[in-house]
Amino acid sequence: NMPSLLYAAKSARAPYMLPAGPEAIDLSHQLLTIPVGTSATITFSATLDDTRYSSGSEPVQNIAAAEFYIDTPPWITATTPLPIAMTPADGNFDSSVEVVNGSLDASGLALGRHSVFIRGQDAAGNWGIVAAFFVDVVETESLYLPLVTHP
């Protein structure tokens, strides 16, 4: 089953720690390709779920925090990754499954591909499985906008 295989691959870095925290799933995002220098805000959301794959053997806690990182994942310690807080869609971190929202000012992003890493933490302090997506910053003339016509 594909979801279990993806979960195993994403948790392989710390297989006895990461599954204790919430998994970031169901990413939704806008503006994945933007011209360099554009003053645009990239908005995105994710669901943080502390109930997945527990089968009753793993305790379930409320989500306590959510954050994202640009270009450097949180487990890289050679540099200091900068966490940026995300907010709960309903205004409160008060359940074991939460939709969280984030926004990123794209005006400072350099030309090229950038990674955005999202993770959540439960009330017991466990950080969970990270999810990620790409944002491409391109030269203005190389921005491809498809033309759709109907016969």
List PLM regions with ranges:
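Proline/serine/threonine-rich low-complexity linkers at boundaries of modular beta-sandwich domains
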Residues: 5-27
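Short, solvent-exposed mixed-charge patches
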Residues: 150-151
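Conserved functional hotspot residues at active sites or interaction interfaces
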Residues: 146
